[in-house]
Amino acid sequence: MHYNFKEVERDVQEKWDFTVNVKDVQCYVLEMFPYPSGNIHMGHLRNYTIGDVIARYKRACGLHVFHPIGWDAFGLPAENAALSYNISPQVWTRKNIDNMRSQLKSIGLSYNWDKEFATCDAEYYKYEQEFFLDFLKYGLAYRKESLVNWDPVDQTVLANEQVIDGRGWRSGAIIEKRKLSQWFLKITDFAAELLDDLKSLNQWPEKVKLMQERWIGKSEGVIIDFQIVGINEVLQVFTTSPHTLFGASFIAVSFDHPILKYVNDVQLIQLIDNFDRKDLIDESSINTVEKFGINSGLVARHPLLDVDLPIYVANFVLMNYGTGAVFCCPAHDQRDFDFAKKYSLPIRQVIFPEQNVDLEQEAYVGSGIMGCSGFLDGMTVDDAKKSMIEKLISLGICKKQVYYRLHDWGISRQRYWGCPIPIIYCKKCGIVPVDKKDLPITLPEDIDFTKSGNPLDNHPTWKYTKCPSCGADAKRETDTFDTFFESSWYFAAFCGIGKGIDKDVCNKLLPVDYYIGGIEHAVLHLLYSRFFCRALTRCGYFDVKEPFSSLITQGMVCHSTYLDKYGNYLFPEDGKKMIQEGKYVTVGRAEKMSKSKKNVVHLDDIIDKYGADSARLFILSDTPPERDIEWLDENIEGVSRYLNKLWKMIVDYDQLEQNFVCDNISSDTLEYRINVHKILNDITNDLEFYRFNCAVAKFRELSNVISEMIRLSINHHVVSEAIYILIRVVEPFIPHIAEKLWQIVGGQGMLCNQLWPKVDPQLLIKKNVNIVVQVNGKFIKAVSVPNDIDDDTLKSIALEVAQRRIGNSSVKNIYIIPGRVINIVITKSS
C-alpha cells in the first residue's frame, strides 16, 4: 500500500472531533492567537505545532484538554488594505480569516473550533467596552492631557511599550512627542504586585521575567528638597544615591519641568521651548543620544554645604520618571560625567577605592570608602547611604520614596479598525459613560480612508449623538482602544464568550496551563494580560491573579537570504538558479523570514509538496523550541523520506499481533524489549519538559530498533508491542500518518483518543552494573556485577581481579562507592 499523504491527511481530518465541555476541562492549552494577515507563515506553524503536541500528549495522558483558537482581528493593516484595495476592513479581515482557518485545519491542529471567535465580533468587544466602564467605576481608567508618543507614519499614539529604540514597533518610524488628551489604564496601581508576583511564575522563562522586572523598574530612593536661590520655591529631587550628595556639582531637570516657569531670559525660554523632544522617548534612547543641556540661569542651594548648584535643563532627564529632577555627581555616574565634561562642570570625588582611579577618563561607579564628605568620611557606601538619609530626614528636607519605571497604559488610538471607546462628551455634563444597556457601540461601515487623520472623527454622522444624562446634543469619543486591549483578556473569553466572562468557569480553568508564543511579547501582551487579570479581579469578574501558569517561548524560523551584485534581495529559488548559471550572488546569513527579504517559505507550497506531517515534524526536529531554527530544503526532504520508510515498515510487516503477549522470551529478545521501553520512557520525559527535538530523535531511534527487530525475525509479539508503542508516541507530532497506521494495524477507535503507553518499570531496573576496581586509586578493571550484590561478595570479586597488582602487599582497607567504584588500599610488605 503506497503512502499518499494527501489522501491520508484528507481522510483523517474529516474524522477528527475535539469538542470538549469546558466544565469538564482539566488542562487548558493555548497559543498566542494570530492576526489575520492573510496567510499562515512558518512562525505560526512552529507556534501552533508546539501547542498541538502538548494538547495531544495531555489528552493521551487521560486529561480533558481545552485547546481553543481565535483571531486578533483589529489593527492598522486592515485600514491600509482598505486604502490600497478599496475594500472595507471588515471584508478584508473576514476573507483572511476564512483562508487562514483553512490553512490551520490543513496542518491538523486539534482545536476546539466550536469556541472560535474574532476580536472584531461585536459580541466580543461589547464586553471589553463593559470592562472599560467598570474600570472607570473602580478608578482604573482616566483621561488626561499628556505628552504622548506619536507615530507620524501610522498617524496614531503608541504606548511606551510599543516604542522600540525610539521607533514605532510596527512602522519603524522615529517617534515624535505630542500633547493630546488620552485615555489611560492605571497599570501602575499594580506595579508592586506585578513585580513581586514574578517570583511565583516558576514555569516562565527567566529571560521573560527579567525583561518584565526591568520594564517595571523599581527604584528605591529618597526625595530631597533643594531651595531655589532668590525664589520662594523648593525643587524636589529624586535619587537612589544620597551618599554622593557631597559630590554634587549641578542639578539637571527635564525640559518639561514646571520649575522652568521661573526662567525669565527670553532667549533661554525660546531655546527650551524649541528643543526637539523626539529624543526624550524612553530610557533606551536617552542612553544613546548625545548629552545636551541648557543652563537655565536658576540656582539651587546645596542642603549641607555653603555652595550653590546651577540648574541645567538636560535631555537625559524624563519628566515622567521620579520628580523630573536629579542632582548630579559626575565623579560617580557616567551619564553625569559625560555631561560635566561637555559643559566644564566640577567633578568632585567622594568615594575612594583601594587603588587610585583616573577621573579624567571616566566616572568611578564601584564601592569604596567615603571621603571629602564631612560626617560620612571613613564610612562604607552602604553605611554612608543610611547615615545621609537619617541626617536629611532629621533636617526635614527628605523622605523615602519608591518609583517605578512603569507608566500608566495609554489606550487611545486615532484609528478606525478598533473597538470604540464607550464615552460621550456633553458640553453640559462633561464626560459621560455610555450606559451598559446600550452596548456595544459598533463601528460605521461607510468610512472614508482617503482623508488624513482619525477616520471616525472625519465621519459626517457617526460621532453625533445625544447625551444619555441630559438629552442634549453630544459627541462620541472617536478614538478606539489600543488593539492590545483585545488580546489582554481573550484567554478568559474562551471560558464564556456569548455571556461575557463565566466567573465559575474562569476560576476553574484559569490560569492557562500551557501558553505558547514569542518572547517579543514579554513587555507588551504578557504584561498587559497580567494587569488585566488583576483589574478584572478587582472589578469582580473572576478571582484570578495570573493569566498563564506555564509559558513556552519559541524561537524564530529563519531562512538564508540571497542578494544580487546591487544588494537587492532575491527569492531563494532565483538565487540558487543564478548561482548555477555562474552569476554573482551573495548568500547571506539565515534571518527571520520576511517578505522584504524575499526569504519566506510558503506553507501552502510545503503542504502541497510534502504534506502537513512533514512540515510539522521538520519544525520540531533538531532544534530546542526556544531557539531559532533554520529552514533547509534538504531537511524537509529528509523528513519526508522518513515518513515513507515508517509507512512501508509498518504496512509491510505481516506478523503483527494485536493481542501480543511478551512473556517467556529469550534473553536477547528481552534486551530489545528493554530498549523499547527505555526509549518510551525517554520520549515521555522529553515531552514533559518540552524537549520536542529530543523526543523526535528518540522515536526515530525506536523506528530503527523496530526495523532491526524485523530484519532479525525477533519474536513477533515483541515487535508488535513496539509498533503499537511507536504509532502512539508519534501521534502528537505526525497525527495524520499515525492515525491512518492505527487503522491499518487494527487499532480500536480513534488513535487521538487512546491513552499513552505505559512503561514497564521492571524493564528499566538495571540487572547488572559496571563497577570500577581500583588499587590505591589507580584503575585496574571494570567488572559487571549484579545490581543487588552484597559488599562481601563484591570485595571477593575485586580482590580476585586485583590479585596480580596486590601481589605480596597487605590490604589495609577497602572502600566502596555503591554502584560505581571499589578501591583497595594496600601497603607494601616489609
UniProtKB/Swiss-Prot annotation:
One annotated Gene Ontology cellular component of this protein: cytosol
Disulfide bonds, paired cysteine numbers: none
EC number: 6.1.1.4
Keyword Ligase on entry: yes
Molecular function, one GO term: aminoacyl-tRNA deacylase activity
InterPro entries named in the record: aa-tRNA-synth_I_CS (IPR001412), aa-tRNA-synth_Ia (IPR002300), Leu-tRNA-ligase (IPR002302), Leu_tRNA-synth_edit (IPR025709), M/V/L/I-tRNA-synth_anticd-bd (IPR013155), Methionyl/Leucyl_tRNA_Synth (IPR015413), Rossmann-like_a/b/a_fold (IPR014729), tRNAsynth_Ia_anticodon-bd (IPR009080)
Record's subcellular location: Cytoplasm
Principal location listed in the UniProt entry: cytoplasm
Enzyme class: ligase
Family the UniProt entry places it in: Belongs to the class-I aminoacyl-tRNA synthetase family.
UniProt xrefs under PANTHER family: LEUCINE--TRNA LIGASE, MITOCHONDRIAL, LEUCYL-TRNA SYNTHETASE
The name this protein goes by in its record: Leucine--tRNA ligase
Organism: Ehrlichia ruminantium (strain Welgevonden)
UniProt gene name: leuS
